[in-house]
C-alpha cells in the first residue's frame, strides 16, 4: 500500500506563505461528518479552553452581503447581541448550514477563519488573549491547526471582543 503526503489545505498554504509557525493535529472521523468541538478537543488531546470553533453570521444591515466570522471556545456559546455590538451591527444571525460552502468555501465542521473565499470581518472571543496558542479548524474535517493567536489575528486583520455568554 502506498501512502501519499497529506495535501495542504488553503489555510495551511496561507500560513506557510506568511511564514507563521503552526502545528497540525488530526483526529479520526467518518468522511464528511462533522464532529462537535468538545469531541475534537478530546480526540486531539487538547484542552478545550484553547480549542476554538468558527461561526459565520450575517448582519441585519445588508443580509446578502454583510457576513461576519466569530471564533469562540468550543465550550462556550456565541452571544448574538454581544457579537452584533462587536461588529457595529444592530443584530446578527447565524447563516444556514447549507450556505457555509457557498459563502466561505469550507464545509460544516471544517470551516477555518484562515483562507475563506473572501476575508470577512473576524472576531475572536477575548479569552484568546490569555493563550499562548489557539487550536482551530485547518480547513477540513479531521484537521486542526495550532498557532499563536496574535499571529492569526494579525494575518486576517481580526479583532478580539467579549462575544460569548
Language model features with spans:
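Extended, low-hydrophobicity, polar/charged segments
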Residues: 1-165
